[in-house]
Structure formats: structure tokens, C-alpha cells
């Protein structure tokens, strides 16, 4: 029987393999023992720590944990709050309809009637002078002389001038000194109110302090625009007109006639006949009323009045009785007639007059004027009906003058 020697063990491959496996299993066993032992030690340590740490300390730890969690959540809450605040700040009632896709800084809501040169580098446009006002007149070439006198009075002051050419003649005005600086708009046989509705939008004339919307048949020898406006501002008039010289003018309503005492009057007195007016009267035409041949509006009053002008009612009859609603306050105080600056209303029959180029006879001209007058009365009735209907249907509107 052979003895078992160490040499033979080292040289036998099978024994070498057995030795390697034994070493591997031994190492694995030791690792398992170490892991399990460590777990028991850690568990035992936690148990001991739990026994040694007071309950209130545990609660504090939990509280700190909750506080830390709330801190982690705060940025998200603040983010929501910021988004909500930003959303509210972006809700602006002043955004112009149609401009929503544009950044606010590029939107120009208003404009003006000032002309800009065609040449030279573009410059930042200066705003219209805060003292500037607007004179707008419907004109025909036959009244060129009287219109020239009116505009000359205004052009020497801080006014922009706009002419509405209802006869289509524009070139024959070019010889007048002020013509090149005026705005000329031409549309055949259209009225002052037709032009005003379409070319004097409140956002276009907003830069101007006052809007003078005058007829062409006015004489202005005793009228000075600058003095007139100083009186209007001092008296707080939002809607006004210069008084008419009773000796030379066509007077349709007594309230427009000039009084020799004082600078302004706001009511008339009539004690006989129909339509009596006293100091207790609060409705037009006794008070709060001007005639439509030479009204003057503040920009705020015009913004209101423009909306009342009807697109299809080109003579605006009936509008005068309701202008007090646009007076920005008590119409018995905010509407008035300026006596110290007065004019003459000649009453020329311009609309529907004869057209020499067409060879119209005087009879035809008279017929045209009669047709104009008839349509004016029809428009008056239509406007009254619309006003009554609008008052009845608008449940959100409050009538400032229920006696009206």
C-alpha cells in the first residue's frame, strides 16, 4: 500500500481542482457570515439607540423631516404662485382688439392728423402739443372767401385744420397760404356728420384738446379762438358753442343768441307760448344744449358723441337734444354758450344747392333743398325711435336724466 505524500498531492490535477473549490466555498462562507453578522450588529445598535433616545427627540426629528420636505415643496408652490400672478398681470382690459398676438410695446392704439415728410431719415415722432386743437369744416368752393377768413383766424394759433370737400373741388384751394398745411378730404355730396363719423374717430383725434366741428357759413370777425378756449376751460365746459349775433344771424333756438352781460350762459328763459323755460328747467333746449352748426367738444365729450352719431343718419338731427349725456357731468353746468366770443350764422343753403356745372335751374335747386329738409325730418324721427328702443332694451344702462 502506497503512502500518501504531499508531493503527489501537488502534482495531481484533480487534487488541485478540489483545493481551488474548497478555497472558494470557504471564502463565500466567510462573506456570508460577515454580512449576516453586520446586520445583527446594526439591528442591535438601532435597538439600543431607540431605547436611549427620548420620545420628544424622535418627534423633533420627525418635525425637522416634515419641515425639510415643506422646504423642498416650497419652490414648486412659489412657481405656481408666480405663474398665477404673471397670468393675472397679463390680463389687461386695455389690449386693443386684434392686437393680442403682438407684444404690448409695438402696439400703437392712437394716432393723429399731423403730416410727416417723405424724405430724410425717420425720426422718433414727437407727440402732438398738449395745447393743440382741431378745426374741421365741410366746404364748397363757392364759400372759399368766408372759409378763408375762418381758417385764417385758427391757423395763426395752435390748430390743425381739416377740410371736408363735399363738391370734390380741391385744387382751387391751393393758392391760399394755409392750404398746404391743411388736410383735404373729398367726397361728393356728403355732410359734415358723414365725414366726422368716418374721419374723426376718437382714437385719431385723441391728442387734440378740443374739436371744433363747424359749418362753413359762419362769420368770425368777433371771434378769437385762443380767448374762447381760455373761457371754456375756466368755466369747465365740455360741450360749447360761440353765441350768435342776434342782429345778423338766423336764430333757430333762443338759447344760442348772444347775451350782452357776462361771458357765458347755460340756459334760456321763456315764459310765454309753448315750451316754457325757467330756472327750474333741466332739459334741452332750455339748458344743456348747443346747436349743431358750430359745436366745440372736449376730447372726452367727443369720444362719447362720436359713438352716438349714426352711420346712416347723415344730418344728425336729434343728436343735439342728447349731447348732454356726453357732457362728462351735469349738463346744466358742463354745456354752455360763450357770449364774449361770438359769430354770425349766415344760413347759406349749401347742401342741395344749385350746381352751375350741371346746369341745374333755380327750381331744381329749390327742389333739392326741399328734399334735404324732408330727409332731415325723417332722420329725426328715426333717431328718436332708435333712442327710445335703445333705452328700453339696455337693462344695464342707467338714465342720468330720467325726465328727458
Language-model regions, residue ranges each:
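Short beta-strand/turn micro-motifs composed of small residues
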Residues: 137-139, 163-167, 339
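C-terminal catalytic/acceptor-binding lobe
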Residues: 2-118, 311-404
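Conserved catalytic core of nucleotide-sugar-dependent glycosyltransferases
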Residues: 14-20, 219-336, 349-376, 380, ...
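Short, acidic, metal-binding catalytic loop of nucleotide-sugar glycosyltransferases
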Residues: 113-130, 142-161, 168-178
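Structural alpha-beta junctions
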Residues: 153-163, 168-170, 178-184, 234-240, ...
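Active-site-proximal specificity loops/subdomain of glycosyltransferases
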Residues: 164-210, 221-223, 271-272
Amino acid at each position: 500500500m502506497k503512502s500518501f505524500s504531499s508531493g503527489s498531492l501537488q502534482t495531481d490535477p484533480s487534487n488541485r481542482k478540489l483545493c481551488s473549490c474548497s478555497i472558494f466555498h470557504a471564502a463565500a462562507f466567510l462573506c456570508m457570515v460577515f454580512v449576516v453578522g453586520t446586520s445583527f450588529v446594526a439591528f442591535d445598535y438601532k435597538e439600543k439607540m431607540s431605547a436611549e433616545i427620548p420620545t420628544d427627540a424622535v418627534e423633533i426629528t420627525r418635525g425637522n423631516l416634515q419641515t425639510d420636505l415643506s422646504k423642498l415643496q416650497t419652490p414648486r408652490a412659489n412657481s405656481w404662485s408666480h405663474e398665477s400672478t404673471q397670468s393675472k398681470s397679463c390680463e389687461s382690459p386695455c389690449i386693443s382688439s386684434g392686437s393680442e398676438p403682438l407684444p404690448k410695446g409695438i402696439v400703437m392704439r392712437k394716432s393723429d392728423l399731423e403730416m410727416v415728410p417723405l424724405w430724410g431719415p425717420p425720426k422718433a415722432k414727437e407727440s402732438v402739443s398738449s395745447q393743440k386743437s382741431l378745426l374741421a369744416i365741410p366746404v364748397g368752393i363757392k364759400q372759399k372767401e368766408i372759409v378763408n377768413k375762418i381758417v385764417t383766424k385758427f391757423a395763426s394759433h395752435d390748430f390743425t385744420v381739416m377740410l371736408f370737400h363735399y363738391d370734390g373741388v380741391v385744387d382751387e384751394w391751393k393758392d391760399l397760404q394755409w392750404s398746404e398745411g391743411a388736410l383735404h378730404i373729398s367726397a361728393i355730396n356728403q355732410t359734415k356728420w358723414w365725414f366726422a363719423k368716418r374721419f374723426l374717430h376718437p382714437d385719431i383725434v385723441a391728442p387734440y384738446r378740443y374739436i371744433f366741428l363747424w359749418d362753413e357759413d359762419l362769420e368770425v370777425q368777433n371771434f378769437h379762438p385762443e380767448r374762447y378756449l381760455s373761457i371754456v376751460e375756466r368755466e369747465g365746459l365740455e360741450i360749447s358753442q360761440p353765441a350768435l349775433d342776434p342782429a345778423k344771424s338766423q336764430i333757430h333756438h333762443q338759447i344760442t343768441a348772444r347775451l350782452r352781460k357776462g361771458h357765458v350762459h347755460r340756459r334760456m328763459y321763456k315764459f310765454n307760448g309753448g315750451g316754457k323755460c325757467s330756472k327750474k328747467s333741466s332739459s334741452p333746449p332750455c339748458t344743456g344744449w348747443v346747436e349743431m352748426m358750430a359745436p366745440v367738444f372736449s376730447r372726452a365729450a367727443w369720444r362719447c358723441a362720436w359713438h352716438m352719431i349714426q352711420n346712416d343718419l347723415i344730418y344728425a338731427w336729434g343728436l343735439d337734444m342728447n349731447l348732454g349725456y356726453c357732457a362728462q357731468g351735469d349738463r346744466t353746468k358742463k354745456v354752455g354758450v360763450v357770449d364774449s366770443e361770438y359769430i354770425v350764422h349766415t344760413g347759406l343753403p349749401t347742401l342741395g344747392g344749385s350746381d352751375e356745372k350741371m346746369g341745374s335751374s333755380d327750381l331744381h335747386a329749390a327742389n333739392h333743398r326741399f328734399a334735404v329738409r324732408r330727409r332731415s325730418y325723417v332722420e329725426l324721427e328715426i333717431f328718436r325711435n332708435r333712442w327710445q328702443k335703445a333705452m328700453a332694451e339696455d337693462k344695464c344702462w342707467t338714465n342720468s336724466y330720467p325726465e328727458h
